[in-house]
Amino acid sequence: MSLYATQDEKKQAAAKAALKHLPKGGILGVGTGSTVNFLIDLLPELQLEAAVASSQATADRLKKLGIEVVDMNHVGSLDAYVDGADEIDRHMHMIKGGGAALTREKIVASIAKKFVCIVDDSKWVDQLGRDFPLPVEVIPMARSAVARKLVSLGGDPVYREGVVTDNGNIILDVFNLNILNAIDLEKTINNIPGVVTNGIFALNPATIAIVATNDGIEERTAQ
């Protein structure tokens, strides 16, 4: 018997539980996605000075709630960055980018003192990449060249039709990658000419994961 009737209720619970890990006042980095949207609706409780958004969609939602959104170039560091994940493992390594905001998410997370990841337990996995493809943001002219390189790494890249990132680039979703060493693969793919970044977040993993399970909220850190 689950405490939650739907997956959305789990997402809401994870979002609410994350609030105590976020600073009151100050400037918060905010990610993108359905779970984060539940959190954004709760952010007025924190009386933030401002927020740095990882996507235009997040910026628009924050502004509607009266939260000032500032350019990251005017911010030295963030006390925290909060975001969801498409997959996360016990090392706090993640796959992100289902919403095509991976590059800006990775940039904003890079200046935060801690990364709070909020997920429901369907996103918790033993190994990254088995069930969810790895998104890779690519400069359009390099699409075919990058795809060939990804095939040589054992992946099956598929062009995400009709999607243009906030940076004007395209997404290749890479299926069937055997992600045994997430840090090495993140570096390898990022070194392919034409790749902006990929959706492995292992070089800068989550600090803590707030996981909504059938039995309630669990707080998990790297093992």
UniProtKB/Swiss-Prot annotation:
Gene3D superfamilies: 3.30.70.260, 3.40.50.1360. GO terms for biological process: D-ribose metabolic process; pentose-phosphate shunt, non-oxidative branch. Keywords: Isomerase. It comes from the Bacteria. The keyword Isomerase applies. Catalyzes the reversible conversion of ribose-5-phosphate to ribulose 5-phosphate. Homodimer. This is Ribose-5-phosphate isomerase A. It comes from Acinetobacter baumannii (strain ATCC 17978 / DSM 105126 / CIP 53.77 / LMG 1025 / NCDC KC755 / 5377).
